[in-house]
Curated annotation (Swiss-Prot):
Belongs to the FKBP-type PPIase family. FKBP1 subfamily. It catalyses: [protein]-peptidylproline (omega=180) = [protein]-peptidylproline (omega=0). Its EC number is 5.2.1.8. This is FK506-binding protein 1. It comes from Yarrowia lipolytica (strain CLIB 122 / E 150) (Yeast). Disulfide bonds: none annotated. InterPro entries: FKBP-type_PPIase, PPIase_dom_sf, PPIase_FKBP_dom. Keywords: Cytoplasm, Isomerase, Rotamase. GO terms for cellular component: cytoplasm. It comes from the Eukaryota. PPIases accelerate the folding of proteins. It catalyzes the cis-trans isomerization of proline imidic peptide bonds in oligopeptides. Gene3D superfamilies: 3.10.50.40.
Amino acid sequence: MGVTVKQLQPGDGKTYPKKGDAVTIHYVGTLENGQKFDSSRDRGEPFKTTIGVGDVIRGWDEGVPKLSLGERSVLTISGDYGYGERGFPGLIPPNATLVFDVELLGIN
């Protein structure tokens, strides 16, 4: 499956992150059953990372560049684009589909 994007709130429609760009994102990550496993919103601090260079799961590297600045969308990521067969012990089962509510706050 890879990654699907469902827009919740449009962004500017013209500014998109490219491979190697640093991005600032708020997100809430859940399993398909709705069980939350991580949230930058709960921590009160946006997450910063570089897109397209393997610093994050493949689903983010491929899904985030489809969002324009200010956009909020749901990324649904199949297990092979997430944590794969290993999962993330104690949080994410093997081959789990992940659902992220993501808001692209900044592109640096």
